[in-house]
Amino acid sequence: MKRIRQSIAALEKAVLAGGDGVSEDVKFHRAIADAARNPFLIGTLEYLGQFLQGATRVTRANEARRADFARQVADEHEHIFQAIEAGDVAAARRSAARHMDNAIKRIEQADPSFWQEEGMKLAHPLVTSLHPGA
């Protein structure tokens, strides 16, 4: 629990200092997987790690452009933490699913200028790693 809480604090600190918070965000998700002691979840995160860093870079850049998005993410992380801390597996699962669903919605609601500017640059390495030759 301590690592999860520390990762939330580190993420907030990084963003307040003007950083993108990508590394800290990925560490938050890894801390949850480690706390769950679920080998499948840990293995999946390790495998997806090659894509997770790039995807998180895209989502964090989009969220940094809008205070409402940034606040939503912070609130979602806090809800996940609180559910885990309370030992409420169902609430943790719902909170995590909501976080993933909302991440997709935030990308869908990204300002078109995001994709014309940094979004496309950030997403390109991710797309080419998934679809070589793209």
Please give the residue ranges for each predicted region.
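Low-complexity, flexible helical/coil segments
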Residues: 69-70, 78-83, 117-120, 129-130
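Short alpha-helical linear motifs
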Residues: 25-29, 66-73, 114-122
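Conserved amphipathic alpha-helical segments that form helical-bundle/coiled-coil interaction surfaces
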Residues: 1-61, 76-82, 91-106, 110
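C-terminal effector-binding regulatory domain of bacterial HTH transcription factors
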Residues: 89-134
